[in-house]
């Protein structure tokens, strides 16, 4: 009697696997925020209830799912610094991640974003662009031995917090072609709705905060803005 060296079932080749890819196309996929433990991941609005949370950080570009003003942070809302910190809003720019353009396909190429005016949408030709050196909001700037001044904060910025709790505003300044750093010296409110009131300039921030090469960081921020700013962009990219 001859016995097989392997079970008969192992000789049967299964059919190729069927893989179904489902892409969420709900309205919330246009959101620019994703905050844990809040309604639909919106960012809490201190002037409203949970249903009125912010959906968008940047100004209305005309192609968002929601157009009512209450969904947009505006200059006052952008003083809620945690909305522009990847630690609290996981969609926002993270300086430790390299943001690449979308993969090209067919005749469609996705090039590095413009460092001054990155497009609002990866492939919609009439979607417009954002001036990264435009004003996002303004805040009081403390000056040593001088009266306080007003600091216009540019769109190309983000916040980071050190282990000892110091909050830093990092501005990738395209007009000066360098990175500027500011320590937050005064806030109001608490929790997710903590709002910055005053900052002071810092020349030597801690190593975790310091940007090694301005040009690369500016390009990385521009790429994030065009290709990774929204929930849908992350899913498609």
Report each predicted region and the residues it spans.
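Extended N-terminal export/anchoring regions of large proteins
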Residues: 1-237
């Amino acid at each position: 009697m001859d016995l097989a060296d392997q079970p008969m079932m192992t000789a049967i080749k299964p059919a190729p696997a069927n893989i179904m890819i489902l892409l969420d196309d709900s309205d919330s996929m246009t959101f620019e925020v994703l905050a844990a433990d809040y309604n639909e991941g919106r960012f809490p609005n201190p002037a409203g209830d949970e249903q009125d949370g912010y959906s968008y950080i940047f100004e209305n570009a005309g192609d968002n799912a929601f157009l009512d003003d209450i969904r947009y942070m505006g200059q006052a809302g952008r003083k809620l610094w945690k909305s522009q910190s990847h630690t609290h809003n996981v969609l926002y720019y993270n300086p430790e991640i390299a943001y690449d353009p979308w993969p090209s396909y067919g005749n469609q190429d996705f090039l590095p974003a413009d460092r001054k005016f990155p497009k609002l949408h990866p492939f919609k030709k009439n979607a417009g662009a954002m001036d990264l050196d435009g004003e996002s909001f303004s805040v009081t700037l403390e000056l040593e031995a001088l009266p306080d001044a007003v600091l216009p904060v540019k769109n190309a910025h983000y916040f980071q917090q050190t282990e000892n709790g110091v909050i830093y505003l990092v501005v990738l300044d395209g007009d000066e072609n360098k990175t500027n750093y500011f320590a937050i010296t005064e806030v109001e409110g608490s929790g997710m709705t903590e709002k910055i009131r005053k900052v002071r300039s810092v020349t030597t921030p801690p190593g975790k905060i310091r940007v090694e090469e301005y040009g690369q960081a500016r390009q990385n921020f521009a790429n994030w803005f065009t290709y990774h700013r929204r929930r849908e962009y992350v899913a498609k990219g």
